[in-house]
Amino acid sequence: MASTSRLDALPRVTCPNHPDAILVEDYRAGDMICPECGLVVGDRVIDVGSEWRTFSNDKATKDPSRVGDSQNPLLSDGDLSTMIGKGTGAASFDEFGNSKYQNRRTMSSSDRAMMNAFKEITTMADRINLPRNIVDRTNNLFKQVYEQKSLKGRANDAIASACLYIACRQEGVPRTFKEICAVSRISKKEIGRCFKLILKALETSVDLITTGDFMSRFCSNLCLPKQVQMAATHIARKAVELDLVPGRSPISVAAAAIYMASQASAEKRTQKEIGDIAGVADVTIRQSYRLIYPRAPDLFPSDFKFDTPVDKLPQL
């Protein structure tokens, strides 16, 4: 029951059985409840009061303190939309029982495609613990490629995966193709193709990867001590300087250097353990290791403490 006070132009909701009771408002459900008898006096009540809070968190992640998502500047309309709740009264339905007011988001097909790609990018980045700046750069790269329409015929998931790979390289935290493949549904070959096409389409480039780009992460994932990591880094760098590994990928050289350093220490790791982390096959590690093994005495740092002498290292 609603009664209007002379002192107040707005209707005041009261309990018909306890008109003087101060109603309790359930903000989540939008209900006005009488504390005396528990009667729900008003439902679907809208709070028309002023909102004095300031929202400084405009990240794309969910913010429980705001209504709806934050604005996305990469989309044409910022992804601002109106959500209509389900009706409860008879007036909310037509003669066939269907809701008269259906929730339709006024979003273009291109924005919808980009939104799906952005969600996929965020999911992939989260699975390999990449920071937000990588996600933002990837989203920007995808938007540029999508709007240029220069990769027509390529799946958006493949383009998104390649953009993530490029963003990692450009931000100085490179990931291998295998690592990107592991968190996407796209093959290494297809990501590689899109990678080359995107660089050409955007007329951009990425820095060449080196063994040092992966060494710290690989050794950390293998739970190797700092001494072994430093030795592996030194071995890989010297192998490149001495031109012992021409044509070999930095990842395979890094894996071989880690294998050599670990075998010389008390913290030994197998080729398979290293291969699983680096994303390379055992045979690939062996091929690079055989190239550097003959010069092993020249590759270790002078202060390295050997648990296994150089002449006792595996010959493979």
Swiss-Prot record:
- Gene3D superfamilies hit by this protein: 2.20.25.10, Cyclin-like
Tell me what this protein is called: Transcription initiation factor IIB
Residues with PTM Phosphoserine: S70, S76, S92
Modified how = Acetylated. Autoacetylated; autoacetylation at Lys-238 stimulates transcription activation.
- Region (Necessary for TATA box-bound TBP complex formation): which ranges? 244-316
Assembly and oligomerization: Found in a ternary complex with TATA box-bound TBP. Part of a TFIID-containing RNA polymerase II pre-initiation complex (PIC) that is composed of TBP and at least GTF2A1, GTF2A2, GTF2E1, GTF2E2, GTF2F1, GTF2H2, GTF2H3, GTF2H4, GTF2H5, GTF2B, TCEA1, ERCC2, ERCC3, TAF1, TAF2, TAF3, TAF4, TAF5, TAF6, TAF7, TAF8, TAF9, TAF10, TAF11, TAF12 and TAF13. Associates with TFIID-TFIIA (DA complex) to form TFIID-TFIIA-TFIIB (DAB complex), which is then recognized by RNA polymerase II (Pol II). Found in a RNA polymerase II initiation complex.
Localization recorded for this chain is: Nucleus; Chromosome
Q: Which reaction does it catalyse?
A: L-lysyl-[protein] + acetyl-CoA = N(6)-acetyl-L-lysyl-[protein] + CoA + H(+)
A single GO BP annotation from the record? RNA polymerase II core complex assembly
The record comments on the domains as follows:
The TFIIB-type zinc-binding domain is necessary for the interaction and recruitment of RNA polymerase II to the core promoter, the formation of a fully competent pre-initiation complex (PIC) assembly and basal transcription initiation. The C-terminus is necessary and sufficient for interaction with the TATA box-bound TBP complex and for the formation of PIC.
What's the Enzyme Commission number for this chain?
2.3.1.48
Signal peptide span: none
Could you give a GO molecular-function term held by this entry?
A: nuclear thyroid hormone receptor binding
- Whichever gene encodes this chain, its name is Gtf2b
Name any GO cellular component annotation.
transcription factor TFIID complex
Where is this protein chiefly located?
nucleus
**Entry-linked InterPro entries:** Cyclin-like_dom (IPR013763), Cyclin-like_sf (IPR036915), TFIIB (IPR000812), TFIIB_CS (IPR023486), TFIIB_cyclin (IPR013150), Znf_TFIIB (IPR013137)
